[in-house]
């Protein structure tokens, strides 16, 4: 089991999702998530954490995303401490994801 998470680019995150079925956890606030979020992202909040634990395999890769890639680091480290084996944080967060032209779902 890894003792820390790894920071990766938005494109590396997309490759993990496409090639290894990684779960992307978006930790931004509900309003922003509802407005737009990466395609198929799980909205991880204090309230949804139990469902997250039920749905996500501890051995599968988990990628955490926030607004700019800062607060996701704390959540990524928390998930490592909870026993997840492969945890990543997206450099640049959702802003970087969107600028990279990767798939997003929007309310508009």
Curated annotation (Swiss-Prot):
Q: Which PANTHER family match?
A: FAD-DEPENDENT OXIDOREDUCTASE, THIOSULFATE SULFURTRANSFERASE GLPE
Span of domain Rhodanese:
18-106
**Biological process per Gene Ontology, one example term:** glycerol metabolic process
Q: What is this protein called?
A: Thiosulfate sulfurtransferase GlpE
Q: What is its EC number?
A: 2.8.1.1
SMART domains per record: RHOD
Reaction(s) catalysed by this chain's protein: thiosulfate + hydrogen cyanide = thiocyanate + sulfite + 2 H(+); thiosulfate + [thioredoxin]-dithiol = [thioredoxin]-disulfide + hydrogen sulfide + sulfite + 2 H(+)
Organism phylogeny: Bacteria, Pseudomonadati, Pseudomonadota, Gammaproteobacteria, Pasteurellales
Which residue positions are annotated as catalytic?
66 (cysteine persulfide intermediate)
> TM segments?
none
Q: Which HAMAP family match?
A: Thiosulf_sulfurtr
Highest taxon of the lineage:
Bacteria
Q: Name one GO cellular component term.
A: cytoplasm
Q: Report the locations given in the UniProt record.
A: Cytoplasm
Location, primary (coarse class) = cytoplasm
According to its UniProt entry, this protein's organism is Actinobacillus pleuropneumoniae serotype 5b (strain L20)
| Family stated for the protein in its record | Belongs to the GlpE family.
> Kind of enzyme, top EC level?
transferase
Gene for this chain: glpE
Kindly list the GO molecular function terms attached to this UniProt entry: thiosulfate-cyanide sulfurtransferase activity
Task: Give the record's keywords alphabetically.
Answer: Cytoplasm, Transferase
Task: List, alphabetically, the CDD domains matched.
Answer: GlpE_ST
Gene3D superfamilies from the UniProt entry: Rhodanese-like domain
Role, per record:
Transferase that catalyzes the transfer of sulfur from thiosulfate to thiophilic acceptors such as cyanide or dithiols. May function in a CysM-independent thiosulfate assimilation pathway by catalyzing the conversion of thiosulfate to sulfite, which can then be used for L-cysteine biosynthesis.
